Swiss-Prot record:
Gene (name only): ureC
Intrachain disulfide bonds: none
Compartments where found: Cytoplasm
Protein name: Urease subunit alpha
Organism: Bacillus cereus (strain ATCC 10987 / NRS 248)
Urease domain location: 132-570
Gene3D superfamilies: Metal-dependent hydrolases, Urease, subunit C, domain 1
Pathway(s) it belongs to: Nitrogen metabolism; urea degradation; CO(2) and NH(3) from urea (urease route): step 1/1
Amino acid sequence: MSFKMSRKQYADLYGPTTGDSIRLADTQLFAHIERNATVYGDEAVFGGGKSIRDGMGQNSQLTREQGVVDVVITNAIIIDYTGIYKADIGIKDGKISAIGKSGNPSVMDNIDIIIGTSTEVISGERKIVTAGGIDTHVHFISPQQIDTALASGITTLIGGGTGPAEGTKATTITPGSWNLRKMLEAAEAFPINLGFLGKGNSSSLPALEEQIFAGAIGLKIHEDWGATSSAINHSLQIADKYDIQVAIHTDTLNECGFVEETIKAIDNRVIHTYHTEGAGGGHAPDIIKIAALNNILPSSTNPTLPYTVNTLDEHLDMLMVCHHLKANIPEDVMFADSRIRKETIAAEDILQDLGVFSMISSDSQAMGRVGEVIIRNWQTADKMKKQIGSLEGDKEYNDNNRIQRYIAKYTINPAITHGISEYVGSIEVGKYADLVIWDPQFFGVKPDMVLKNGMVVMALMGDENASIPTPQPYYEKKMFGAYGKAVQSSSITFVSKVAYENNIKDKLGLNKVVLPVKNTREISKQDMKLNNATPEIEVDPQTYEVKVDGKVITCEAVDVLPMAQRYFLF
């Protein structure tokens, strides 16, 4: 005999289900649950009087070797580029082993995830689970960035640097084999996935090649070192030879040629264009039009996202500091001014929303904020819904198309671009369990818990001397996965395939999981999930007006945002 209950009763017990919608933080974005992989009446729930008990939802006969998982997240709402749905998530050996229904196969039908004596439970009822974020534009200026990134839901950092040196403060580059070795050694201490870019500014193939053998997962070309056509061509030759990615910050001053010369030098080869909007750097005023090309994998950084009344004012001073410019030198001021164009900044929000720009990253401490990739991603999505309206296919209390487009920008698309999508970037079976758990009202702002390879590394935690975990002060703190040898087993250092094959792990005495990047050269804009539009883009050289397929695009700066002061005292 079946038992009926109201949707509210069900949501209180097990979390929302198929047909329900969840508001994301204080935005106007609503995630609509498309399906439920759990079974009504057989929900796996932990706690006093609940179902995960010996002989009920927990099988105490089967062992770990017989399929029992290490960790299960129960009744979670999954938000991923693959869909928005409800399911249990099984984790074994640090990887996602199954997504579906958990429980005891001895007393329940159609069990995908076996809960046993060896299983730890994380309650996902009324929680949202996303893949860990990937930030591909990181200046490794200070190691403290890593805690800030983790606390925001970022689990992979890709970029370059050696600390607060002038080269690092301006460019995301770890130059040469010695510096790469030192940063790979330093990476051992951090409970986060890391990959380092070598310097691509060279017309010497051997000088570029030695960095790939030293473990660089790619090359970065930056205008401050000279973004010449020769450097572009040589870096891409190395990329094609060793299956690595090239990232580029193009020539703002157009000293080495205009955007057309850069496009010619790239010569239809795939490349990741940083600062495609131009405010952070790149051919003035029309670098933005490069996003129309199918071989370009475009990203933009978070200081210009979303466009607000403060965006223009803060950029000049940031630019002067980050690029070693002097306010008393007129040429330096003119250089800075040439980058900051409200017309292209206003167009950036639109291009992100249309799926023309495929990724969002930080530009950490070098005009961007490492802890705000996720916040600004969703602020932009909310701003666009309010200013433009729902995307095609979305409707009242259902913004799934927009939500899936935007989550892809900081998860799967950066992973595909830099050759790590086999390991991370989405909630799919076989990938490492880099997962972020959110309370819906704090979604995108403050994670409830961050898992690395299935182990909790960061979580909200209260006073350690309290009788329960939640008394104030209640804030993000490192957990056991961030200490001791667990750091090495719960996180990954990415290296080039040739360095991996030459056993760089043993040569440098690395203890972390070391994995090679792969499949970066035979991809295109069409591989960017839900963000693969290639319209014609024009920029007026006098007015900086941006047109997409002949239509002017712009948006208003806003003075109020969600996910902001409501959540932060400072």
